[in-house]
């Protein structure tokens, strides 16, 4: 299946020196993921494994994880979020490594009361430290139809796209002493859970459990990545994807989205960083 993370930058051409370690997954939830928590609240709805739902009630949320770990790659999924009053709920699609000094790349969708927009929260963690938040209000209602969300992760940068449009690029800042996720393989995760103490207006809006169960849908899960196997994942430095970046059109589109729809950027939060914004922001 053709991946559709975006037309504004070249597709990643991922391969390993050991050919058996290269995998392109065409999106079967039956084969490629396991619903690892939720006690039946996560369900695969079709024989081909293309459609999966996660539900949340007052007792528990639910989630799934990929069967494979990846060290670099491109992952996408189509999502349709919880409709109506979703205050206090968090729906996610993200990459994460295990352990106490984990790496993580986040798409998190923070619910809201009826008639108010979701907040799309993005973040990057390295060695257990994040604090690199950018947040957006989407230019569409993400509860009406499915929309495509994609993470592209390579040694130079991480690119977040929505329906093929880049909304964020986080470049590798190791040259200035800022960590970047380059060494820890990550699994893909998705979840629906309750965080009413902070998710909606800083916790002012609480979850209305009379509306439960809350349900989000995922379909057309795709991964093109370097699979971590036998303790290593050796990708060829001669591959063009090592130097891929947004072209001028991609940069223009991203800046347009950020100017219209970004509602928070840690790089401009001088109150939070009174002694100066983080080094990668300058």
From Swiss-Prot:
Residues glycosylated per entry: 112
Function per UniProt: Catalyzes xyloglucan endohydrolysis (XEH) and/or endotransglycosylation (XET). Cleaves and religates xyloglucan polymers, an essential constituent of the primary cell wall, and thereby participates in cell wall construction of growing tissues.
Known tissue expression: Root specific. Expressed in all cell types in the elongating and differentiating region of the root.
Compartments where located: Secreted, Cell wall; Secreted, Extracellular space, Apoplast; Cell membrane
Chain sites annotated for binding xyloglucan: 108, 121-123, 131-133, 197-198, 202, 272
Known partners and oligomeric status: Interacts with XTH31. The formation of an XTH17-XTH31 dimer may be required for XET activity.
Gene name for this UniProt entry: XTH17
Catalytic activity: breaks a beta-(1->4) bond in the backbone of a xyloglucan and transfers the xyloglucanyl segment on to O-4 of the non-reducing terminal glucose residue of an acceptor, which can be a xyloglucan or an oligosaccharide of xyloglucan
Active-site residues annotated for this sequence: 104, 108
Further details from the record: Knockdown mutants have shorter roots, decreased cell wall xyloglucan content and increased aluminum resistance.
Site label Important for catalytic activity, positions: 106
Disulfide linkage: 226-235, 267-281
Induction context: Up-regulated by auxin and brassinolide. Down-regulated by aluminum.
Family note: Belongs to the glycosyl hydrolase 16 family. XTH group 2 subfamily.
GO biological process terms held by the UniProt record: cell wall biogenesis; cell wall organization; xyloglucan metabolic process
Name the record gives this protein: Probable xyloglucan endotransglucosylase/hydrolase protein 17
Stored Pfam families: Glyco_hydro_16 (PF00722), XET_C (PF06955)
PTM remark: Contains at least one intrachain disulfide bond essential for its enzymatic activity.
Coiled coil: none
Cellular component, GO, one term: plasma membrane
All copies of domain GH16, residue ranges: 27-218
Keywords: Apoplast, Cell membrane, Cell wall, Cell wall biogenesis/degradation, Disulfide bond, Glycoprotein, Glycosidase, Hydrolase, Membrane, Secreted, Signal, Transferase
Cleavable signal peptide: 1-26
């Amino acid at each position: 299946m053709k991946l559709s993370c975006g037309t504004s930058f070249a597709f990643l051409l991922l391969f390993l020196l050991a050919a058996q370690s290269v995998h392109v997954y065409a999106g079967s939830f039956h084969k490629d993921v396991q619903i690892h928590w939720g006690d039946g609240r996560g369900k695969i709805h079709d024989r081909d494994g293309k459609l999966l739902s996660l539900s949340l009630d007052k007792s528990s949320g639910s989630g799934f994880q990929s069967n494979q770990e990846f060290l670099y790659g491109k992952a996408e999924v189509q999502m349709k979020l919880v409709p109506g009053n979703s205050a206090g709920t968090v729906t996610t699609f993200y990459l994460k490594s295990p352990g106490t000094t984990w790496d993580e790349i986040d798409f998190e969708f923070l619910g809201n009361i009826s008639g108010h927009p979701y907040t799309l929260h993005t973040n990057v963690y390295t060695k257990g430290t994040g604090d690199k938040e950018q947040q957006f209000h989407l230019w569409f209602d993400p509860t009406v139809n499915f929309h495509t969300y994609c993470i592209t992760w390579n040694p130079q940068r991480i690119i977040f796209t929505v329906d093929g449009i880049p909304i964020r690029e986080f470049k590798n800042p190791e040259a200035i002493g800022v960590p970047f996720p380059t060494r820890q393989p990550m699994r893909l995760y998705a979840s629906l859970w309750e965080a009413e103490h902070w998710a909606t207006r800083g916790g002012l809006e609480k979850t209305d459990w009379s509306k439960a169960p809350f349900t989000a849908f995922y379909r057309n899960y795709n991964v093109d990545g370097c699979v971590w196997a036998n303790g290593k994942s050796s990708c060829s430095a001669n591959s063009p994807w090592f130097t891929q970046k947004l072209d001028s059109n991609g940069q223009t589109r991203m800046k347009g989205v950020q100017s219209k729809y970004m509602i928070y950027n840690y790089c401009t939060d001088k109150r939070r960083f009174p002694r100066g914004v983080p080094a990668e922001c300058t």
